[in-house]
Every structure is written in structure tokens, then in C-alpha cells.
Amino acid sequence: MFLVTVSSSAALAAQIQQPKGLVSFDLRDKYLIVVEATVNGMGPFSFLLDTGSTHTVIDPNLARQLHAPVVGEASLTTVSDVRMDKMARLKEVRVGDSAASELGAVIDKMDQVKLKAPGVRGVLGEDFLSQFDILLDYKKRIMRFDGAAPAGERCRIETMGHYRGLTTTNRLLIEAEFMDVSGGKLQLQLDTGAKMPELFPVRNDSISAHPWAGSMAFSSGLNGTSIHSHATIRIGTTMVHDVDVVQSRRGVAFDAVGLLPVWIFKSIYISHTGGFVVLNPAD
């Protein structure tokens, strides 16, 4: 998950070409989606598809290979730190028949990403994905661009949030409720790059409190985190049972209370144009 704040005139508006068709993807560790993309007519290159990343990211070697011009800098916020990176301009990024042009891309080594998905050369973020309505089918390992919306409950998503007093864009924020305890609905980021549901430390400016107040048994996780076992999450009328939820102690917080992994649904239709998702749509 990357949250990018562009600090120069490098904020580039993607120009859209009409996409059609299905694209197959590789599923790593049962949750990470890796697709093949061409960039500036070169490739294909392996990219991690990450709805939790606000911007597309490429590694320095790919930037050099593409001769991508640097157009500014961007502040890259991850769940562990904040750093400044260069931003390049990509003439075109294409997945299957779906393409966006004049896309800004952060240049970053992506060390943590490459540990989880060896061989990837970049991350396709929401600045690219938000140009399309997308169906992700984890069972069939296919994605469809700009197909008709399937039947099913439409759960509202917010594509803008707030972080450190600034408006964030290219987001997929959705309300979810943890049924095991009281606390009401929380706004979580729908994240294809997340393995487990995760709650961040409570911020002073957070409008939502964490649902757990010692009422659930938990075990100690990695890095001092707490893992709440056998939780039930409700999104709209969709219930997801028996999931483990990480309560993180990471120092960096975001515009959402936590992360909601997309893979916990067998499929999902994301309508960026309509501002809704359909969870587990019928075939």
C-alpha cells in the first residue's frame, strides 16, 4: 500500500483509451495479483495490481530502461515510513486492450513489494485503475475492464479521503462493521495488496474508534501486533466469517482506520464511475 502526495507540477491527468476484453493474472500467495503490462510500447513487464496504492510505481531499472523523463518529486507514505521519491512521466501504460496515457509514476526500489512478489517491475495503482470499472475474479484468475455492472448489492465507496489536513485522491474507502464487538462502522481501504484485515493505531483526528476494548481473546503477532481471531466482518449485507484481524502498532497512519483485503471475496466488481462495489457477484 502506497499513499502518494505529489509535491510539484507533476500531477498528470491520465488520458483514456476505450478498453475491452478480459485479462488473466497470476495469483501469488493466494492474494497478490500480478499482471503483465506494456509501458511506452515496451514489455510486457510484471506489475503488482494494488488498489491500496494511490499512484503507479516503477523501479529505477525500469525507469532507466524506458528513458522515462523525471518531472518532479512525490512524498511516498507506506505503512512503515515516509520518504521522498522522484516522479516520472509514462507516455502509455497498457494492460490487455486497456490503456491510459500521460501517467505519473513514482520511482522507488520497492524492496518490500519485491520480497512479496519477486520479479515485479512496478505497481499499478489507483491512478491507473480508477480510469476503468473492473471485475476481479480470484477463482478464475481473470480481470475484466469496463464490462457491465453485475447484479447484486451495490456498496458505496469513497474515492477521496483526508490525511494530515489534506485531501487524498485515488482511494477505495468502504464502510465495514466488526460484528463480534460494538463500535459501529469503520471506514477501511479496499486493498488488493493486503493479506489480512488490519486496523491502524488510533489517531487523534480519527472520527472512528477501534471496535475492540479487550472483549476478544487475541494472540501476539509479529512486531508486537495483536491478532484477533475468528472475527466476523459485515459490509452491506455481505458477511465474512472466521477471519483473523491484525491490530497494528505501526507508527504511520492513513486516511482510513485500516485495510480490508479484497481477496476475502471470491470476486468483486469495482465501479469507479458509479462509486460502488458489488461483492461476490453471480457469474
Name each model feature, range by range:
Residues 11-283:
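Pepsin/retropepsin-fold aspartyl endopeptidases
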Residues 1-9:
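Bacterial N-terminal signal peptides
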